[in-house]
Each structure stands twice: as C-alpha cells, then as structure tokens.
Amino acid sequence: MTESAGSAVVAGIRDLLPVLRERAQETEDARDVPAESVKAIEETGFFRLLQPTRFGGLEAEPLTFLSAVRLIASACGSTGWVASVLGVHAWQLALFPPTAQEEVWAGDAAVRASSSYAPTGRAEAVAGGHRLTGRWSFSSGCNRATWVLLGAIAAEGEGRPVDFRTFLLPASDYVIDDVWDTVGLRGTGSNDIVVDGAFVPEHRSLSFADVFRCRCPGHEVNTEPLYRLPYGSLFSYSITTPIIGMATGAYDAHVAYQRERVRAAYIGQKAAEDPHGQVRIAEAAGELDLAWLAVERNMTELMELARAGEKIRIPLRLRVRRDQVRGTGQAIRAVDLLFENSGGRALKTGTPIQRFWRDAHAGRVHAINDPERALSAFGRGEFGLEVPPDAML
C-alpha cells in the first residue's frame, strides 16, 4: 500500500467525525451502529485497510488502521468499537486457508465479519469438518456483518478436547438474538449468535495453536509482513485503541466545556482559571499521550521485525501485552479525571462526557484488558518462567 492511500483513508475518517458525533445519541438509543454510519465508514476505505490486496484491500500499516480507529471512537465510542473489531477481522480472515478467503471475498470484497471467541458452544468432529452448536455472546456489530468468527473447543466424536479453534460461518448458518441492553457501549449491538448443528468445513476453521505460532494456512498466499504479526499483539490493540479514542473524545469535549464554564459554587469562578482543574487536565492529557506513544512504539517495532523477516519473540509479545493493558488503564484514568472535573451537569443524559465515561468503562471489562493476567505473564517472562496460555499472546 502506498502511504498516500492510508493517509487518504484517515483524512476521509476525519471528515466524517462531525456526522458520527452528531449520531452518537442516536447510535446509543438504537443499541446498534446505524447502517448509514457503517456505509459512510466503508466508503472511506477503512474496512479495506487490513484486507489483502488480492481481494481489493490496502494492506495498510497497523498504525494507520489504529489511528483511524482512535479518530472514530473520539466521535462515538460505540461506532469506534464496532469499526475496530469488524476492521481487524479482515486481517484474521487473511490467516484462514485460501479456500475460505475465496469463499468470503471473491463475490464481494466489502464483506464484514463479527466475532465471539469464548468457547461457549460445542464443535463435534465429523467427516470433512465440524458440526457446531451453541450460543455465543458479545458479538459486536453482528447486525452489520454477513459472516461470524466463533471460538470453540474442537472435539473428536467421543467428546475428547483436541484443539481451540475459530470457526467461520455465513449468516445463513446462524441466528442473531437481540439481547444487548447495557449501561455502556450500548450502541455496539453486541448480541448473541445462536447456531444449531451447522456444518463447518475444515477449510473454514483455524487453530489457535497455529495462530500463536504465527504459522497459518493463509500465509501460503498472504506473504506480506502485515500478516506475520502475532494475533495477540494486533487484536489486543484493536480493543484498547477505541478506549483511548473514547477518552480522547472526552478530553476534547471537556476542554471545550470548561473553556466556557462558570462555576456558581465558587462565586462565579471561570473553570478555565481553576488551577486544580488545570492539573487534572494536564494529568489526563499525559495519560493519553503515554497510552498512544506505546501504540506507536510497539506497532512500529513489530512491523520492522516482520519486514526484516525476523521472528517476533515472546519477550516483545509480552511487552506489547503489558503496554496494551496499561494503555487501557491510562485511558480509564484519564476519562475518570475528566468526568470528576466536569461537575454535575456532566451527569445529564445526552452529554458526551458521561457517554464516553460509560463506554470506556464498558470496554475496560473486555477479557483482553485483564491487567493482572497480562502483567503477571510479563513478570513470569522476566524471571524465565513458563508463560501461561491465557496470556493471549
């Protein structure tokens, strides 16, 4: 991809921000991202950023993708979240066997997939593939997708667990159960996916063991450095970056509000002249800068190694996860500082500060943001101890 193509996508997203900001309450009320918003984002080329060029994609730098995600989330947290998870799935689809990629993209390069990775369903091995049954929750953006990626423990006929796999299913093989009703990220439409005995051919499943080793069937045709990145490094930042964006949106809204605010409780003091408020703003800005600088450092270093054909080793993968969970924490601390400094009017329904605050905290509880798990794994690595599989590297 040329640098100008990625820059054009980011510029297109920047132009969309006023519209996405204006639709933020509508998105929350609908409990789903409006189709018009997804279409507008699609027209910028955003969903093609991580898609292989052989299927009309741009194969952009991960940092370009994450920069666009941060912008979208700074206008509407729910829209940024959905855009990020749908967008990163194009990268994961490129790891599947070539036959699966052809099946998904050959007819329509604009296809999108949602996901739910927790292995809450059952996959039974049958001739030529697996039979999938169960219910999967938290499939963000599923109403704006026509495929889904579902996690399950693949078992032999007698039920013996053999592998944790991701299964790829078309919309005709599942039902969406509209159950999403939450206090945060309300507009993500993260509904349940219900599957009843769908047959999934072997070429539409991907072993997490292969993903962890960065040796996937899709590498046969997608040889570019982008697809050599560790799944845990890119996917984890696709969850943290929207939260950084939400906190950035809260920061922008807060500064604009404080610039004009007069604090009646302090005898008409201008909020902008309050030294205590100034300190909170400085601290919030510092947290956001630290979080984003780590994104830039890690994505740049990962891509440099991938381009050089070098193996991305466990110590770096541990550091990326360490920085990623800390980045989430830094964004949460920033949005908390801003919310606390906003006064009672920020509690009113419809104000952007409270929406960003709720959305950021909702994103924080995603499994990939468990700080103790990631930080403990980093500490174990520093002492040369075995790193547990749940470190999600």
For each predicted feature, which ranges?
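Basic/polar N-terminal segments that are highly enriched at the extreme N-terminus
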Residues: 1-15, 391-393
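Glycine-rich flavin
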Residues: 33-43, 47-145, 160-162
